[in-house]
Amino acid sequence: MADIIHEFTVRTGPPRVFHAMATPQGLTHWWTQSSMGMPQQGAEYQLHFGPDYAWRARVTRYEPDVAFELEMTQAHPDWMGTRIGCELEPEGRESTRVRFYHSGWPSANQHWRVSCYCWAMYLRIMRRYLERGESVPYEQRLDA
């Protein structure tokens, strides 16, 4: 098994970071083309990345402003059963330490290596959105 882990600070409080990482509206600002679902334990999320990429995930951890996790239930075979999540910790008065993970990959294959890079890019876009209010159109995100 292989995992992707990123840890970084965002200059805003945990409630805003949690909203960006755990709600369909928040995810659409930095990761998905569109998302649907109820942000609650056991709910199903629909994650859309274009016509050939309509994926699904189940919320397996939901602790407001603290932690969130999705288990992929319909996705690329390498992503099936993997878990995407974050743990948040206040850092100072107006910052949040984010521990992001995408765990349970079958191996550190080519897709895993590409996804490591893509997650870093997407998380950077999320941080820019939260800290500066910048919104990057979906089609331009991997070039931002």
Segment roles from a protein language model:
Residues 8, 56-61, 82-90:
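Hydrophobic/aromatic beta-strand elements that line small-molecule binding cavities or substrate pockets
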Residues 28-29, 34-74:
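Glycine-rich portal/gate segments that line the openings of hydrophobic small-molecule binding cavities
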Residues 1, 50-52, 77-79:
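Glycine-centered tight beta-turn/hairpin loop motif at sheet-sheet or coil-to-beta transitions
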Residues 3-7, 44, 54, 67, ...:
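Intrinsic-disorder/low-complexity, polar/charged segments enriched in Ser/Thr/Lys/Arg/Asp/Glu/Gln
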Residues 75-123, 137-139:
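Beta-strand/loop substructures that line and gate deep hydrophobic ligand-binding cavities in soluble
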Residues 17-21, 27, 45, 59, ...:
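Hydrophobic pocket/interface hotspot
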Residues 1-36:
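Hydrophobic ligand-binding cavity/cleft-lining segments
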Residues 128-144:
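Short, highly charged C-terminal tails/helix-capping segments
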